[in-house]
């Protein structure tokens, strides 16, 4: 019993485990958010999307729904089970990322990006609240700084991984008619980066 109390104490081993899991979630958050930037040329070529539309997809559509849902989801984090809110949000934005690979044009892709923004809006307020419970006040600044590293990891991974998937798919299937299900490189990339969040 003493060992259990030590494990689950504020700032104890389980608190550190929670922090690591939240960093991983934040990493997935940024991967799914940033992956669009590495796919811009493929999207313009295959879907006929313009630079202006890409700017809308990358910025306005995502940010609007992130901001709109951020406040109510932050309030929900105060009232409901935070780990459940984070888990549901993670699955939702991961599914929306995968569905982005099925988009047939600007409208459907924008709708899926709306979904990504809405899902990701659940993560940060609930995580800040959760970590504040698991760590004492004199450690929260360093804990939140550590948590924030997930953003930089995610941004780096999204560009590197996205580029690798695109290059691999193009070299393996120069003629996409011969690719599995006729998938384009951008479609495979959306699906591959979204899937891990569902199983986490």
Describe every region a protein language model picked out.
Residues 1-31:
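Cytosolic juxtamembrane N-terminal segment immediately preceding the first transmembrane helix
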Residues 34, 62-71, 121, 155-156:
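Residue-level signature of mid-helix packing/kink "hotspots" within the transmembrane helices
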Residues 39-68:
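Extracellular/periplasmic helix-loop-helix junction of adjacent transmembrane segments
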Residues 42, 71-75, 164:
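Membrane-interface helix termini in secondary transporters
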Residues 48, 81, 102-108, 119, ...:
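Helix-breaking motifs and short loop linkers at transmembrane-helix boundaries and internal kinks
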Residues 68-107:
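Conserved MFS/SLC helix-loop-helix module at the cytosolic interface between two early adjacent transmembrane helices
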Residues 111-152:
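Cytoplasmic helix-loop-helix junction between adjacent transmembrane helices
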Residues 147, 151-200:
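Helix-loop-helix hairpin linking two adjacent transmembrane segments in secondary transporters
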């Amino acid at each position: 019993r003493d060992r259990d109390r030590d494990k689950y104490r504020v700032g104890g081993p389980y608190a550190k485990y929670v922090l690591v899991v939240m960093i991983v979630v934040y990493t997935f958050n940024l991967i799914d958010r940033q992956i669009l930037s590495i796919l811009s040329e493929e999207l313009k070529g295959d879907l006929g999307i313009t630079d202006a539309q890409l700017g809308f997809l990358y910025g306005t559509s995502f940010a609007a729904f992130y901001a709109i849902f951020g406040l109510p989801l932050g309030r929900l984090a105060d009232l409901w089970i935070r780990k459940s809110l984070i888990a549901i949000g993670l699955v939702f934005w991961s599914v929306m990322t995968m569905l982005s690979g099925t988009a047939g044009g600007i409208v459907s892709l924008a709708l899926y990006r709306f979904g990504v923004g809405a899902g990701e809006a659940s993560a940060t307020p609930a995580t800040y609240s959760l970590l504040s419970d698991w760590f004492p006040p004199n450690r929260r600044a360093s804990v939140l700084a550590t948590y924030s590293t997930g953003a930089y990891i995610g941004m780096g991974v999204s560009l590197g991984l996205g580029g690798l998937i695109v290059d691999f798919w193009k070299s393996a299937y120069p003629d996409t008619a011969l690719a599995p299900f006729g998938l384009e490189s951008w479609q495979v990339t959306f699906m591959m980066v979204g899937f891990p969040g569902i199983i986490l």
